[in-house]
Amino acid sequence: CAAKLSQMDRLGIDISVLSVVPLWLFHWTPAELAQDFCRQANDWLANFISGSDRLAGMATVPLQAPDAAAKELTRAVTDLGLRGVQIGTTVNGIPLDDERFKPFFDVAEESGSTVSIHPCYSGKPPPFQDYYMKNLTGNPLATAITASRLILSGFLDRHPRLKVILVHAGGFMPYQIGRLDHGFQVRQEASAHIQKKPSEYLRRFYFDTITHAPAPLTFLVDLVGQDRVILGTDIPFDMADTDFAHIIEQAQLPPSAITAIESGNAMELFNLG
């Protein structure tokens, strides 16, 4: 805990919302093993953040067993004081809009728990093994695919109050939303389950700032609004954005946007006030 707080001090971070690493999502293991692991991981995280009021946490759940995941989320939020949950983009290859996950998302929505979606691979890896593309290209692609499904399947209409974060600034999704809108207009498959253009669903999501460059961050804030973007770092990974302050400054955002992105939005989203 002391080392984490010291790191935050060096970076100028007042409060951090922590989650387990994606490798620990354990969506691909037998359900019983995942249930036991998630319970221990959440207990550990709750104990870790209890050492400081500058730390908060997000749970992990055995989503391959949706009823058990719903129960663990309830325990993590109610008993442990965690502020939400992190899940993968798929669960052992099954997309999140599949009806089998409804019990979990119902509880997340009813409890007001924020759901952060992070790329997670299981089974056969994506065909991006060269040049570190599994991360550089595969991660934002996985997020874009999942976000597309959540929009086009009608999932967001079925869960109108669910709070969802798309990490890595939404992957490729925000930058190709016009393509989905065009498909909605010309293809029956893309309009069968929704009544509005896909772009009208973008503000249902929250997006972190991890663009690694100011220009795409400027575009993102202009596209979705300053109230839908929160500061993200990806610490402690090699792809972490520890230069976030400079990037936000170079994005030439108005002072109100900077305040919202650096503090206000996350304070409200995670009930940190």
Q: What role is predicted for each listed range?
A:
Residues C1-V91, E99-R100:
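Mid-domain alpha/beta scaffold segments of enzyme catalytic cores
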Residues C1-I15, D43-S50, K71-R75, L162, ...:
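Mid-to-C-terminal alpha-helical segments outside catalytic/metal-binding sites
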Residues L18, G57-A59, I117, L166, ...:
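Structural beta-sheet core signal
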Residues A31-Q35, K134, H246-I248:
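Short glycine-enriched, charge-decorated loop/helix-capping segments at active-site entrances
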